[in-house]
Curated annotation (Swiss-Prot):
ANK repeats lie at residues 50-79, 83-112, 117-147, 180-209, 223-252. It comes from Oryza sativa subsp. japonica (Rice). Coiled coil: none annotated. A zinc finger (RING-type) spans 321-368. GO terms for molecular function: transferase activity; zinc ion binding. The lineage of its organism: Eukaryota, Viridiplantae, Streptophyta, Embryophyta, Tracheophyta. GO terms for biological process: protein ubiquitination. It is an enzyme of class 2 (transferase). Signal peptide: none annotated. Pathway: Protein modification; protein ubiquitination. This is Probable E3 ubiquitin-protein ligase XBOS32. Keywords: ANK repeat, Metal-binding, Repeat, Transferase, Ubl conjugation pathway, Zinc, Zinc-finger. The gene is XBOS32. Pfam families: Ank_2, Ank_4, RING_XB3-XBAT31.
Length: 496
């Protein structure tokens, strides 16, 4: 009888859980809040078979407010779906930078890799060309220091790396490898994502990293290929020039003995003949990426320590932010000393596309003075750190509505208790981007739908067209893992 009771409660939770999934997918914040107030354990609900949580649905659709709500309810931020993907990977895949920013503020694990391809959030962002997401994922590795770009550009400088720069940690992060030895730079170069290539190179991505034959891949370009080989296959001249300017070798050969020029010819990239046939006579001038954004680390640290959203409202704001005129000032820009609310400073760092001298600084919206870092204003109180709710769901049972007289939830401590005139309007989410490679006519993607959004296994090249001229790994038939940029494995959509 007790077992039947548990089963009955489980089915009751399933109905509420499906409602939460629908609310997370559709962006219904009020419905999601009401369901979580009724039963906070629903935050850990996962759909049958697909094992996709409400957090994955909200992240894939770009509903950053629902993502915040779920995290404040105590859901595990690094929860995986059936492919081993975290919410951070989903947000990076679809380019939802606001969701990425929210997850990074809650300290999402950026080192997690998925089960199918061994790719991290950086790989997903680079593959789909989302430079802003890529930069947010690396927020804790790029210090707010004025000479950062010059230090990274001239790694052989006699001065050596700055004490504030963890050069080894940044190098390992930017050059982490997925299955087959693929780095984020390989993926961005193949698809011609110039902004991602430029940013990765500025952050220390290696141009000599080569792919490997790991027994689980079908590599149509060839094992031992550098990012320049992949750029030659993709056919983007600017990507090739950027890589050559950073020291990529034109004579490097992969395991098949092909140079980048030979790869370009085999893929009929005739426009690259002149670029790849001879070394440039003079050094190619490089400019810093507009996404470098040096103040990002400082404002992210301040937001985590002091909070970035506001609960209490007041009819009159004392010292309001000059940008939004709603939140009270909590941070100041180093240099010009102009003050902003933390949320506006976060938005400024995440969306600024204009870079001023020194490289990576962003212009102050009030005086255009370069901003390299932000500092917290004196008197700003840190938020209290409370243990997060345990939401174990061995059997998720329905529970009565929360008493209005109960103690405040952890959500109330994630906001600064300062005054505010009106609620900040929600920031718009970027739209989904096409997963197809426009410059590779032989490459097609067959989108399958999962979690209410496109969740195509990020693979680019259809293999059946090439016949026996490309060698297939002997172990491919025994392994279900495939290198994502070079094969496609359609997965049927799951319900709800």
């Amino acid at each position: 009888m007790g077992f039947l009771s548990l089963v009955g409660n489980s089915f009751g939770c399933s109905a509420s859980g499906e409602r939460l999934v629908s609310a997370a997918r559709d962006g219904d914040l009020q419905e999601a809040r009401a369901l979580l107030e009724y039963n906070p354990r629903l935050a850990r609900y996962s759909t049958f078979g697909g094992r996709n949580s409400p957090l994955h649905y909200a992240a894939a659709q770009g509903h950053h407010e629902i993502v915040s709500l779920l995290l404040e309810s105590g859901v595990e931020i690094n929860l995986r779906n059936y492919r081993g993907q975290t919410a951070l990977m989903q947000a990076c895949q679809y380019g939802h930078w606001e969701v990425v920013q929210t997850l990074m503020l809650f300290n999402a694990n950026v080192h997690r890799t998925d089960y199918l391809n061994g790719g991290s959030a950086l790989h997903f962002a680079a593959l789909h060309g989302h430079a802003r997401c890529l930069r947010l994922v690396l927020a804790d590795y790029v210090p707010s220091m004025p000479n950062f770009w010059n230090s990274m550009k001239d790694s052989l400088s006699e001065e050596g790396p700055s004490a504030d720069l963890d050069e080894d940690g940044l190098f390992k992060m930017v050059n982490q490898k997925a299955d087959g030895g693929l780095t984020p730079l390989h993926m961005a170069a193949l698809n011609g994502h110039v902004e991602c290539v430029q940013l990765l190179l500025d952050l220390g991505a290696s141009v000599i990293e080569a792919t490997i034959e790991d027994g689980t891949t079908i590599d149509l370009i060839g094992a031992g290929s550098t990012p320049l080989h992949y750029a030659a296959c993709g056919g983007n001249a600017v990507c090739c020039q950027l890589l050559i300017a950073r020291g990529a070798s034109l004579s490097a050969q992969n395991a098949s003995g092909w140079t980048p020029l030979m790869v370009a010819r085999s893929w009929h990239r005739n426009s690259l003949e002149e670029i790849l046939s001879k070394e440039p006579e003079s050094r190619i001038r490089t400019v810093p990426s507009p996404y470098l954004c040096l103040p990002l680390m400082s404002i992210m640290s301040i937001a985590r320590e002091f909070g970035w959203r506001y609960l209490n409202q007041s009819p009159v704001c004392i010292d309001p932010c000059a940008v939004c005129l709603e939140g009270s000032c909590s941070v100041a820009a180093e240099g010009c000393k102009h003050e902003f609310c933390t949320r506006c400073a976060l938005y400024l760092c995440s969306t600024s596309y204009t870079s001023v001298s020194p490289a990576g600084a962003i212009p102050c919206p009030l005086c255009r003075h370069p901003i390299i870092a932000f500092t917290a204003l004196p008197g700003t109180s840190p938020i209290r750190e409370l243990p997060r709710n345990s939401l174990s769901l061995s059997f998720c049972t329905t529970c009565p509505a929360v008493n209005s007289d109960s103690t405040p939830s952890i959500a109330s401590h994630l906001y600064r208790t300062e005054f505010q005139c009106a609620r900040m309007p929600p920031m718009g989410s970027s739209s989904f981007r096409s997963l197809s490679c426009q410059r590779l006519p032989a490459m097609k993607l067959n989108p399958s739908f999962c979690m209410g959004a496109m969740d195509t296994n990020p693979c680019l090249i259809r293999c059946s067209r090439f016949g026996p001229s490309f060698r297939r790994s002997a172990s491919q038939g025994e392994s279900s893992r495939r290198a994502w940029p070079l094969t496609f494995d359609p997965i049927a959509a799951t319900g709800s």
